[in-house]
Every structure is written in structure tokens, then in C-alpha cells.
């Protein structure tokens, strides 16, 4: 599974336009092959900070997503509303490593998230 986290800051006057754009994008992306989840959130202390979280079955599905017409259209429209560049991080998770360990596996220490 591939997880993608994108964060960006909006110009305050563009927030309503971007929320409409984001809702459209979520609907389109959730229909794509390999999309497990596609969600966006506003910052708690700054409602102009947007965090986009995506989960994809694999890298091929994510690359297909990047090549869609609606992705190109979204990025073109979004760029006019940004106060800061988009910051993106990607993570890979193997399903077997996040499931419960078998009786013969030693449990790794819990990871602390900051």
C-alpha cells in the first residue's frame, strides 16, 4: 500500500473555491482503480492549511492517478489559490508488516509518532 500526505496553505480569499474543487476531486479519485481512500482536512488552528491523505493499493495505481486528466486539471486550478507550495510525503507499507504478528514472530517495539 502507498500512502501519500500532501500539505498546503491557501490564500484566505480562495478557501471556498478550493473546498469546491477538493470535493469534486475526492469524488473522482475515489472511483479510480486502486484508490483505498482519499480524504482532505482543514488545519485545527489554521483553516487555510489543508492536509490531503491518500491511500493506494500500489505504486502502479498511484502513477495511473497522476496521469489522469482530472489530476492535471486539479493541479492547474489549485496552483492559482496557493499561498505556499505543496509539500508531499509518500510512504510504503507492506500489508503483512502491519497485520498482527503470528505466534512465531517477535513483536517489534511500538513506534512513537511525533
Regions found by a protein language model. Give the residues of each.
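Non-catalytic surface loops within mature trypsin-like serine protease
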Residues: 10-12, 58, 92-95
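N-terminal first-folded block
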Residues: 2-40
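Glycine-rich beta-strand-turn "strand-cap" elements at beta-sheet edges
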Residues: 40-46, 76-114
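Short alpha-helical
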Residues: 13, 45-47, 69-73
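Intrinsically disordered, low-complexity acidic/polar segments
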Residues: 15-17, 61, 97-99
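Generic alpha-helical hydrophobic packing signal
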Residues: 3-9, 18, 49, 53-55, ...
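Short, well-ordered beta-strand segments in beta-rich or mixed alpha/beta enzyme
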Residues: 2-8, 39-66
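An amphipathic, aromatic/His-enriched active-site/gating alpha helix that lines ligand/cofactor pockets
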Residues: 24-37, 55-89
Amino acid at each position: 500500500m502507498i500512502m501519500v500526505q500532501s500539505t498546503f496553505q491557501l490564500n484566505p480569499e480562495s478557501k471556498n473555491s478550493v473546498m469546491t474543487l477538493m470535493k469534486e476531486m475526492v469524488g473522482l479519485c475515489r472511483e479510480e482503480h486502486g484508490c483505498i481512500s482519499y480524504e482532505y482536512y482543514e488545519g485545527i488552528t489554521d483553516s487555510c492549511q489543508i492536509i490531503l491523505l491518500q491511500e493506494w493499493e500500489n505504486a502502479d495505481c498511484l502513477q495511473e492517478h497522476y496521469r489522469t486528466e482530472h489530476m492535471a486539471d486539479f493541479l492547474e486550478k489549485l496552483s492559482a489559490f496557493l499561498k505556499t507550495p505543496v509539500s508531499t510525503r509518500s510512504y510504503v507499507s507492506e500489508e503483512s508488516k502491519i497485520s498482527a504478528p503470528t505466534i512465531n514472530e517477535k513483536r517489534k517495539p511500538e513506534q512513537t509518532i511525533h
